[in-house]
Amino acid sequence: MTRIPPHPTPGAGRLGGMALLLAITLRPVVAAGQLPADSAGTVPLRRLSGVEVSASRVAAEEATGSAVQRLDARALQERGVVSLADALQQFSGTYVRDYGGSGGLKTVSIHGLGAGHTVVTYGGLGLSDHRSGQVDLSRYNDIGDLAEVCLYTTDRPALLCPVRNLGAAVVSLNPLRPPSGKERFTQAAIETGSTGSISPSFHHARRSGAWSWNAGGRYLFNQGHYAYVVHNGVATERRHRRNSRMQALTLSGGAVRRDKGSGQLELLARAYLNRQELPGAVRLYLDNNDERMAERETLAQLRYRRALTPALRLETAAKYTWSDSRYTDPGAEYPGGCLRQNYRQHEAYATAGLGWRPAGWFEAAYATDVIHARMTSNLETDNNVWRTTWLHALSARFTAGAVSLTARLTGTLLYNGNAAAAGRARNARRLTPWLTLGWQAIRTDRAGLALRAHYKETFRAPTFTECYYYHYGSPQVRPERARQAGLGVTARLQPSARLALTLRADAFGARITDRITSVPVTLNIWRTTNIGRVSSTGLEAEAAATVRPARNHRLEAGATYTLQRLRNATATSSPLQLPYTPRHVASARMGWINPWCNVALNLMAFSERWSSPEHTSGTRLCPYAELGATLWRQWALRSLRLTARAEAVNLAGTEYEIIKNYPMPRQQLRLTLTAAW
């Protein structure tokens, strides 16, 4: 892999530019054409069709028993969200694992089930990585390309959907769409940060007749040399993170055609490329690491939806994904002086389904998916493996007044193949039921109360790494099976036009059988196997309030809390919390939208965690809290709208680790200038 050229460390000139931009941002002078806060302060730079959450949409979701958490484009801007990981951390029940830095691996686990049980969709279709089994969220950090981020933890409101989208939890990423009411829209932005990062981006959308299309891209360079502290007994050593430079390029585009009748065709394509240095885990007395990683991924998908009759609806989609990963680690201990691991994956995916609603009280749907995945590598094993998966889902929904009952039965057939027939992974077949109950006990213009309950079973197939990786994988590994149940309530109250309150609470429980884990076979060799059961129980809650104290002023406040107990449920096991899962997670936010300078504050707090099942002082990760602040302001100059933002991350400079020996950055400053027309 070509070595990334050196990049100068930001100097006094850059810091001076930051200070100047910050001063302009905070200056309370009304520019020509300045809009009031309820227009300039609250309307996002991009006006997106179908993004605003209407009362009817929320009521429909609550009526079906769905537990949905959502951030649209407006909320992403007003809350000071700078990355997808930041957005997900504002949802209750989530925990993001971050290996540090802008290019570090980032995954999300819901209710402690693990990233492998979380489905991530982009543009309505599921993403996948058959080698690792988890989606790297850092590849989708371009918030400017997202119109909406949603989290579903019970069931989806739509009865007809691709079967792969029916997971233990679903994170839905909806890309930017052409704006409503405008023929064209363009947005350009430049972002810089105190760790030596710079990121220009560009998005354009246009509408012409029945067609609308959009295209965009983002480039990121980050030096990544942030400071951290190494503790060695009573001694401490201050260092800067080395070998953490990265470059990443994201390109995306799409088109939508709406027929005069009720058909809609959607096309979407996306490409992602990066080259990065891997800093590795922190070690005492050593600060050098020469690992490199280069990744490429492209995807193209097509979706078509049409109402064949007033009672019959058709949905079809197809998708192809190609990805390539190249890892190098120079070292005299390797044959030839370098360790090279190259992986290439292909996935072809197709889905089709019919939805039938003969009466207002009854609805049924059937969908089927076919997935074929292949992986090749330069290693002795897992060098030519493939898997074909056939999914089915039969669903029905019964509605009687304010009560809704949804039932699903999903079936899965797994067929594995390998160049060496003797080493093929086990085939599998499963039937898994779902049941969701929703009741809108109160629904008025001023108040609402919705109750829900659910039970569902899902399972996770072992990844290619768990089946085939040299001296680690085992072809005999069985899929994990998860059983989940929960009860929830959502209450909404709007006593006046100036005040709105929302309260949501859910109690959940889950049990995973045939847990896939690794056990030592010899001193230096580990092997993947099924062992034991895992139990997850807990509670999540969210409270939010919106206050309009005066004209052109709006106050937003909210808080979330998650309590989860994740332990090994085997009879002979210890009841201790499993690794990397905090028992308590809390967040709080405040925002003030006003005519002068908008303000957003975010606080995240996590209890102690452990890096292994043994709870000792050497495996303990200390509890921590992280405070962030954002200041931003908009100016309107005829058809041009400018936005300047200043963001302070980890304002208190807290030292913490999410993954053992991978320190996170302390104080960071980000400045962003955006122009839209």
Where are these regions (language model features)?
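Periplasmic-side early beta-strands and strand-to-turn transitions of outer-membrane beta-barrels
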Residues: 172, 181, 207-293
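N-terminal periplasmic "start-of-domain" segments of outer-membrane beta-barrel proteins
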Residues: 47-78, 107
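N-terminal periplasmic accessory domains that precede
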Residues: 84-87, 106-109, 121, 136-142, ...
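Gram-negative outer-membrane beta-barrel transporters
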Residues: 360, 365, 402-405, 506-511, ...
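Extracytoplasmic beta-strand/coil segments of soluble accessory domains associated
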Residues: 85, 89-126
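Membrane-embedded beta-barrel scaffold of Gram-negative outer-membrane proteins
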Residues: 311-329, 451-456, 480-537, 542-546, ...
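Surface-exposed extracellular loop regions of Gram-negative outer-membrane beta-barrel proteins
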Residues: 415-418, 425, 430-431, 439-486, ...
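Short acidic/polar hinge/loop motifs at secondary-structure boundaries
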Residues: 126-155
